[in-house]
Design a protein with these regions (language model features):
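Low-acidity, Ser/Thr- and Arg-rich intrinsically disordered low-complexity segments
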Residues: 2-25, 29-30
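Rossmann-like AdoMet
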Residues: 35-130, 134-189, 207, 348-351, ...
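A residue-level signal for conserved active-site and pocket-lining positions in enzyme catalytic cores
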Residues: 74, 193, 329
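Short, glycine/acidic-enriched loop or turn micro-motifs at the edges of active sites
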Residues: 132, 161, 199, 285, ...
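Conserved protein kinase catalytic core
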Residues: 164, 202-203, 288
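A mobile, often basic/glycine-rich helix-loop segment
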Residues: 194-242, 293-303
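Long, Lys/Arg- and hydrophobic-enriched amphipathic alpha-helices
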Residues: 240-413
Length: 413
């Protein structure tokens, strides 16, 4: 069903989303996942009670919520949001690079060493990591930089106590070189602000191109026992300009997302540093391809290993993601005082850090172990090599994008 004329006056209208259902996380994350919201139960017993009630009360008192607010609550509700209740890594729906192999953290440690050297070898050099999950990257990178002689300290930005406890246990004795804050507002330091697969969980405004280039926003409402999608006017005037830019490339009916939190986040990241770098690794694309290649948008939902059809069904029980618009992020970083470099793939970035040499060494070690009849050792090395190769696989993790930006610092080399 096409939107009715009521949408033009700013009143939300029921719409029928034409989104498909294609998995786009690792190993294959190239297509968007749509959702059919016509019959999604708001009373399912698996939906967290407090979150469900909060959403229903907000919609009842203020009307339909922009999808961005629904996504914020579903992921980050303090008691029932997805990231408030999940144990990092337990029942995960995909493997991140740090959880796949310790070699990712070891290679990233080389990047930190280059940064540390480029800004004059400060003591300490801080890594400020947002959304560190289990803490695998920190544990592996801290061990490697310690062997390199880099005086590294780690600052975790984590709002949930249970995740902090998990990270402390993962680090073990190295936790003595780390600290935990709830946001980026701590004392500014020299080092690097790091976010690995974090920005794709930033809540997004979902917009749809209407006739004559008009753009409308997706809202979420409750209708009886169901959450439903509605179309309405833009909820924030600051969306108008970027929405017009995207709509100029798209046909009526196409959808796209805008993350309104990126600008403020980049400002906070800049304020967290006296000098140093911003390092972002995530699924995403550049304009205009990110719009043209995903005409139904990129919002996707997952429960454990499975893609699920709707983010409106059982909020809090599943992850919700949207591909990162790295063109918009680079602009936000520049406005915040960073000097962004060209965006590259994780595959290209890891090649610059020596992954090919590591692969050769593992392959040679495995071959020699096999020649000597050390079957178990050869098997372990072969498995380690296979996992290393996955980091740069162009059909999977290697296709993640990497953005590095400097603040009052030279380009590392």
């Amino acid at each position: 069903m096409r939107p009715t004329t009521a949408a033009a006056s700013g009143m939300p209208t029921v719409c029928d989303p034409p989104w498909s259902s294609t998995v786009r996380r690792e190993p294959a994350r190239s297509a968007g996942v749509g959702f059919d919201v016509r019959r999604q139960s708001a009373e399912s017993p698996t939906v967290a009670g407090s979150l469900r009630q909060d959403l229903r009360e907000r919609m009842g008192s203020s009307g339909p919520l922009p999808f961005v607010d629904f996504m914020q609550a579903a992921l980050y509700h303090p008691s029932d949001g997805y990231y408030a209740t999940r144990v990092p890594g337990h029942g995960s729906h995909y493997r991140t690079s740090p959880s796949l192999t310790p070699w990712f953290g070891r290679l990233v440690a080389r990047e930190f060493r280059r940064m540390w050297q480029a800004i004059g070898e400060p003591d300490p050099f801080w890594v400020v990591e947002v959304g560190a999950g289990q803490g695998d990257l920190a544990a592996d990178a801290m061990e490697e930089t310690d062997a390199m002689g880099v005086p590294l300290r780690w600052r975790f930005i984590e709002r949930f106590d249970r995740v902090r406890d998990w990270q402390r246990r993962r680090l073990g004795p190295a936790a003595g070189s780390a600290e935990w804050l709830t946001d980026l507002a701590g004392p500014p330091v020299a080092g690097c602000v790091l976010a690995n697969e974090v920005l794709d969980n930033f809540p997004v405004h979902v917009l749809e191109v209407a006739e004559a280039g008009r753009v409308q926003e997706i809202y979420v409402d409750v209708d009886g026992d169901s959450f439903v999608e509605r179309l309405g006017a833009l909820s924030d005037v600051t969306l108008a300009e970027p929405a017009r830019e995207a709509a100029a490339h798209l046909a009526p009916g196409a959808r796209f997302e805008i993350s309104s939190g990126v600008e403020a986040w980049c400002r906070n990241a800049s304020q967290a540093l006296t000098r140093g770098y911003l390092l972002l690794i995530d699924y995403g694309g550049l304009e205009p391809d990110i719009w043209l290649e995903h005409p139904r948008g990129t919002v996707a939902t997952y429960r454990r290993e499975d893609a699920t059809p709707s983010p409106l069904d059982e909020p809090g029980s599943k992850d919700i993601t949207a591909d990162v618009n790295f063109s918009a992020v680079a602009r936000a970083a520049q406005s915040a005082g960073f000097r962004p470099e060209p965006v590259i793939t994780q595959s290209s970035w890891l090649l610059s850090l020596g992954i090919a040499r590591v692969a050769e060494e593992l392959e040679t070690a495995g071959f020699m172990a096999a020649l000597e009849g050390l079957v178990e050792e050869a098997t372990v090395l072969q498995d380690e090599l296979g996992r290393l190769i996955q980091l740069g696989d162009a059909g999977g993790l290697g296709n993640l994008l990497v953005l590095r930006a400097a603040k009052d610092a030279p380009t590392p080399c």
